[in-house]
Amino acid sequence: MKTRALITLILLSLLATATNAIAAEKREVLKTYSVKMVKAHLPSAPNNGTDDYRCFLLDPKVTEDSIIRSIQFIPQRKDYVHHAIIFRVTDANISEAISRDKSGTGWPCFGGSGLGGMLSSFVTSPWISSWAPGRGIDLSPAGYGIPFKKGERFVLQVHYNLLAANGGKIETDQSRIVMKAVPSKGATVKQLHVELFPAPVELACPSGVTGPLCDRKQALIDLAGRTNNASALEAAGIAALCGQNPFKPIASTTSTCDKVMNSNFTVIAAAPHMHLLGRSMKIILNPGTSAEKLLLNVPNYNFDDQSAIVLKKPVPVTAGDTIRVQCTYDPTLRQKLPSLSKLAPRYVTWGEGSSDEMCLGVIAATKS
């Protein structure tokens, strides 16, 4: 779990597993807000592609400053909704969002919400939540929540993977969001924010596998045709964010990015997001030093279970610390997985489509 969504991103899930979190929610005076897409959307992929990314402006009609305790994306078409991301619309972007969704039918948004410029999601992180297979209600841990101001709105980005439609039948979708919140006034709940940690993806065709799209340049041209030009530039943008040379990419089955923090915060939970070639992910604080701590370790990544993991003990991070995200992949899965095996071999980069890849670590934290 839109920046770029999306990446796909995925996204942040704070799916509660502890009974004390559930009990705490029951004791709170919660107000429920439910909102669905203004109009039903019939997914379609551009230029003979297989993926449709669509953003919708939604107004939950929140009447007071609040703190979100739980939020749930409820897909109407579970078979081909690949993932969804819920963004907060910032004051700076509300006019643009209203203009883009005048008809209530949303707008194409490969790579984030499309608001605020390229890679804005990775820079400003206006995420609230995300959904992917295996996730249910996104419930913050006991004592924590996400601030949401009176009158604020969501942008809901939905990724439709049309390859997954049952029998190839595509129907209209009108998914919805259900949110539970407490008033900010008088609340003792600590406020969470989201930090995103992307890494470049550069996967060459496996040994012995050939085809026109095994050439990186041709693969990026194809990516632009299936999505848009901005999406094809994301690989270079993310490499630059990670301090790597975007003009000299190095193919590898391991993706890594180090990010130096410029503020203090405390990590409460972490979640992984990759696509179908992903094998493992780690998020490491201060790697290679005596202060090294493992924030997230997913040794056997499962696309159908991208739930966030609440840390046993919150971990403080200070300005100047380094956080590394590291992902590993198996490109041979393109020839083995039913959903990918019929597609042409290709050099795989960061991209929004189900047949592209991502390496995205997501952290939920409180500001110090």
Annotate the PLM regions.
Residues 8-17:
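Bacterial N-terminal signal peptides
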Residues 24-266, 271-368:
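Beta-strand-centric surfaces of beta-sandwich/beta-rich domains
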Residues 1-8:
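Bacterial N-terminal signal peptides that target proteins for export
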Residues 18-24:
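Boundary at the C-terminal end of the N-terminal hydrophobic targeting segment
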